[in-house]
């Protein structure tokens, strides 16, 4: 689909267009394909407009807030809605978008719902009624306004008179940390509650899952996705890393199966840059990349890929030299990755920092160092953090740990409890 849109975009751009308007769209995935295609051809402004049903969602189930979150992260210059309903029904969707929009919003309603009279399609909303509701749309947050089906020059003239002197709504200047699937979104807040990333969809150590994947079956993947959603996961990690399969194709197949089974946003997890890129290209939402370190391949190639596809990423404080020797080195890596991200237009709102958990049995100070990282990220860097609890859990099962070590860790947890995301094995 991207290639089809690229062919059109290339011709339109060469013909001298000033901007692109992708409108009356019913699928968020098609919107993504169009924006990606245009951005791969030129840098002209892009406006994207979807059409919504009476239930406030597109035909494929996307709500207004999710649409603006995904499309503005992908690089759209304005997002909104057109057609489908009369102007009154557009007020609430515009308000929903305005809560998250960092780009201008547009609204182009019909002149009411169409009626068939004596074989002729008729729109009942008068220019005066249309203009009156148009002012409410501007108050709701629309910065660009117009008309769609059934509107006439008289409707647009009345609209201009009604809204011409109204102040233009300015989008939010502070971004929010948002992830999204095609049908829902979640926010990662520094002052918010714990969030859970379900990480069971990973063949490592799971012989039954490995055998099934080698047979080309994703039945267990679907079951694991459903079980984790039912048990409270808010984000699902997808990892297909194992020998004996086409990992890239299996990742793409798994994403399709999981997004068809549950609504949760996904975390794309692979050690291969090309696999993450392929996954981000087809994922119908805003994903979390697991992960980007200061290693050359990750920082030079994967970071721009995350930017291109509008993804957030987990910052892993590692470098080509391996594990940091101490907290100071770890802090330096975090600062440098943030600097590199900001240099290409990303920011703190696009990042979650991995605490880099080591096993307590091997290093009794591991938990304290981990919590020190959490404290540094939250209090000095204003960055949320992520912690792999399976490391602690397996350590408790297999390695002896003294009461003193456990008490020290427990006390530290009580003092520094504000992790923001807690990956967990269900």
What do the PLM-derived regions correspond to, one by one?
Residues 1-354, 358-426:
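Domain-level signal for soluble alpha/beta catalytic cores
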